[in-house]
Each structure stands twice: as structure tokens, then as C-alpha cells.
Amino acid sequence: MAKKSMIARDVKRKKMAERYAAKRSALMAAFNSAADPMSRLEIHRKIQALPRNSAPTRIRNRCWATGKPRGVYRDFGLCRNQLRERAHKGELPGVVKSSW
């Protein structure tokens, strides 16, 4: 189980990324379309003025059951240990143990 403070920090980052997503994407579009170096510099400063935690790259992919940050399967949102346990119990619909 991950520390609750780390899970809370990640939740805070997700909310902040949602809040600033439209503004960040508009600034990025303007930055990519600007031809003048001075206007690009000005737009870049505006992007840098946004909060760091509003960047989607700072969001960590975590297991929703345990909060573990590593070994998380995107399709299920579970870490490998929880995926194995729940698959054996039959709690994941459509997951079948392979045999060949």
C-alpha cells in the first residue's frame, strides 16, 4: 500500500491538470503556430507561469486498489499483484487463464 500522502498528491495533480487543460492546450497551440521568435518567447513564459502540477506529465499511473505506482496495467488500472489475485477469484470479467 502506498503512502496516503502520495496518493493524495497524485489526486491533487489530476484535479489541477483537468482545471488547466484548456488553457494549457490553447497556449501550446499558439506556441506551435507562432512564427515570430519574440511572440514564441512570450507564450513560452505564459506556459511556464502555469502551476507545475497542472502539467499532465506529472501525473503518476497508480493502482486504484492499493495506490502502488509500479507494475500498473492500464487496461485494468490495477497493479500486477491485484490483477493476479482478482483474476484468480474471477472478479475481472473476460479474463481467462491462458493454456496452450
Curated annotation (Swiss-Prot):
Sorted UniProt keywords: Ribonucleoprotein, Ribosomal protein, RNA-binding, rRNA-binding
GO molecular function: rRNA binding; structural constituent of ribosome
UniProt GO cellular component terms: cytoplasm; small ribosomal subunit
Gene3D superfamilies: 1.10.287.1480
Organism domain of life: Bacteria
InterPro entries registered for this protein in UniProt: Ribosomal_uS14, Ribosomal_uS14_bac/plastid, Ribosomal_uS14_CS
Any single GO BP term: translation
HAMAP family per UniProt: Ribosomal_uS14_1
Assembly with partners or alone: Part of the 30S ribosomal subunit. Contacts proteins S3 and S10.
Function: Binds 16S rRNA, required for the assembly of 30S particles and may also be responsible for determining the conformation of the 16S rRNA at the A site.
Family: Belongs to the universal ribosomal protein uS14 family.
The name this protein goes by in its record: Small ribosomal subunit protein uS14
Gene it is expressed from: rpsN
